[in-house]
């Protein structure tokens, strides 16, 4: 019997709030480079192929050859907003094709886990479970989710200097 919520169906031209957190609520972004790497992978997956060039690098800084370049989802996913917190992330997207989100999220999270595990010399899963999604059905919900994603870091602002997370209305274009 399949796990609850293990089979997900998403429609084309739908808006979705996607989120996930670290297993045991662990930190999934340990330093600024981790945030930048996750954002870099999103940018690479969502940029037109002619803009990607040969920019993808592994954790040691070596360029990944074109034969190993990632899939591209620029015609399947439109990024609306995102927020990366120390132990979780939120991504708000418009899915253009029927299967874009599932492939995009699988590619993004697998590549980030590979980077993270190599960098921190660990093995195993990084995320608590498969990502969760909420379909945004109307303008009120759209506004609420956008505000929620951008206010999320304000809830845990530190008393001193230092990053609490990264968030933006799609600045990856």
Question: Predicted segment positions?
Answer:
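Short catalytic/metal-binding and nucleic-acid-binding patches
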Residues: 1-172
């Amino acid at each position: 019997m399949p796990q609850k919520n293990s089979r997900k169906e998403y429609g084309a031209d739908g808006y979705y709030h996607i989120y996930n957190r670290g297993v045991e609520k662990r930190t999934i972004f340990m330093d600024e480079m981790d945030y930048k790497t996750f954002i870099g992978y999103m940018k690479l997956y969502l940029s037109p192929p002619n803009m990607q060039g040969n920019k993808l690098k592994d954790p040691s800084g070596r360029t990944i050859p074109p034969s190993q370049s990632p899939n591209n989802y620029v015609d399947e996913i439109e990024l609306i907003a995102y927020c990366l917190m120390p132990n979780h992330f939120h991504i708000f997207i418009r899915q253009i094709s029927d299967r874009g989100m599932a492939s995009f999220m699988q590619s993004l999270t697998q590549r980030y886990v590979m980077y993270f595990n190599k960098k921190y010399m660990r093995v195993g899963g990084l995320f608590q479970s498969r990502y969760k999604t909420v379909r945004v059905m109307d303008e009120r919900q759209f506004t609420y989710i956008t505000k929620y994603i951008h206010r999320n870091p304000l809830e845990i602002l530190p008393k001193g200097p230092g990053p609490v997370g990264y968030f933006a209305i799609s600045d990856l274009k």
